[in-house]
């Protein structure tokens, strides 16, 4: 199993290293025969001798083309002959490429920016993560001491915790009497002990949570300050910290550094991405949070260190569990794309598609287009019409079906052969013409991207069939990871066409796909309304909610299935409309904002959720009760009564203060905040009292009644004393409870002022409620 690849330099020449796991043992394969190269398209092939004479300087060494060969390739589906120019060292390419490009005989140069080790994996047909080797995994986490205003890495590391299949342990330099704690004498000894643990356990995978941007950099800085060689690589090297966009990325040679943070941000939509806020939705169990100021207080006083050690241990354990959960999926993406898991786990979906296309282009003898320069990038910012959205029918509706197109955009790309190499191509016998925009796509041959996409969808269907057939739960889970990885890639192609930095960028392709999408959804809606008696309540891009007013549930379900039998044979190619669900009740507020309830009383909402931590418990609880009243009981008036009851209790100060706590995270150094929100104001007052506040600290506060700005009246919740303090009921009514329910009840004709307990006026309710069956 290939873990990763890189290159080193020996005697001025590159040596490829392939890090592998074979039969349970780690090994490194070396290849000294692979040469860096680029392609050049010439106006006149006789100019090749002049091209070979071009020189440049790199670190005092003269750089030139070492040899050249003429090769037959394809470019965007058309035959082309190009020159393959070889060089001594990969770093020669950036030193000389502009000089070659500027030669009058050169039309352009290609594939000059593909990293050497990645080029090697593609050209040699090597696929990382293939095989059934069992990889050893170890997760680690650190706790640090931070004082406001300190430079990064100035405060000591207090604890290093780690977890693997044998359990979780904590290394620290204070005596803590717990069975999983190992105490050493100093911070320096703690770091050295951790390095020894890595050496002894020799993991193939190091799992962190934001290790790219915190743990590794902090450990490396403290190691330098303390005179410790921070060697973690299997080749005896220190971790390599490199910039990747606006973030950092850390490589450990011979080991996969699997940072969960970018993976989870790409995979799950959450309001915040702390370890605690991620762990609960993934595993369904809360994880305790110990705040930075509590850690500092415990460390400096010596009281409560057991709790901090337990928290540190549980951090490592949670990171390990999350790593085990997410690693198999990234391994499948790595296999699918053909690049290392280290790269894949830090890539956007657009980059995943691009690496997949680069490999397939090589396999099909295609020269890849270049990435855009700054001028071209600016030109690619022009927008175009997106998917169709029908404004929702207001009111409370019953017996609703949801129908949507199966993989709408991928199906359109394949069915209509939408690809840069088929776009407006002259001399074809047959074209598909996109509605509204008029772009033509040749149907005489399969386009590069539609053919690859078709292969992916076909493979996914085969994998899903295997899933159904197997009785082995482990095999089924692995197959499920595989089909999900394929789905991620397949669903990214439309977005890739519109991705400004893409090699195979095609605005005409993207706007043609959405134009066909609009046509199909609008035609389908018209057919179901005119021929089957449905009323479409809301539609968005690839699906719609519909009902038959006055009909019972069985009638609506049966008629929907009749419609599918009618419409699907009339759709071209891979286009297929599916029955996605039935809901006994629902309402639709505005675009992308609705709530429905199924026959098992499961409520699904979109655009109405208040899951951010800066909503108090009373706001979340009130919204949940309002949704239940409307959807479960079909009673909008009950929902209004609930809101009035809550606002009345708030006004009378009958709501427990615990339900009014607001949590907000400090995301940067306090000195860099210009706007002082309540959480920042509270944090600054805490810091002034000596409590350590750092980025990531979550501030819990409650707003008191009184004059002045909200920030001046917000206090830490643990300082709230019911005997001395009164919370600001008006603040919680106007800024928490009413905003949480107003957009829901507005759909039924209620205004904000109608929802407070002292007002009883109802605005036009009868016009909004639909008859129940």
Curated annotation (Swiss-Prot):
Residue span of region N-terminal domain: 1-131
UniProt keyword annotations, A-Z: Disulfide bond, DNA replication, DNA-binding, DNA-directed DNA polymerase, Exonuclease, Hydrolase, Magnesium, Metal-binding, Multifunctional enzyme, Nuclease, Nucleotidyltransferase, Transferase
Location of region: Exonuclease domain: 133-385
GO molecular function: DNA binding; DNA-directed DNA polymerase activity; exonuclease activity; metal ion binding; nucleotide binding
Chain positions recorded as Mg(2+) 2 binding sites: 141, 143, 315
Annotated segments matching region Polymerase domain: 390-773
Nucleotidyltransferase listed as a keyword: yes
Role according to the record: Thermostable DNA polymerase. In addition to polymerase activity, this DNA polymerase exhibits 3' to 5' exonuclease activity.
Homology family: Belongs to the DNA polymerase type-B family.
Name of this chain's protein: DNA polymerase
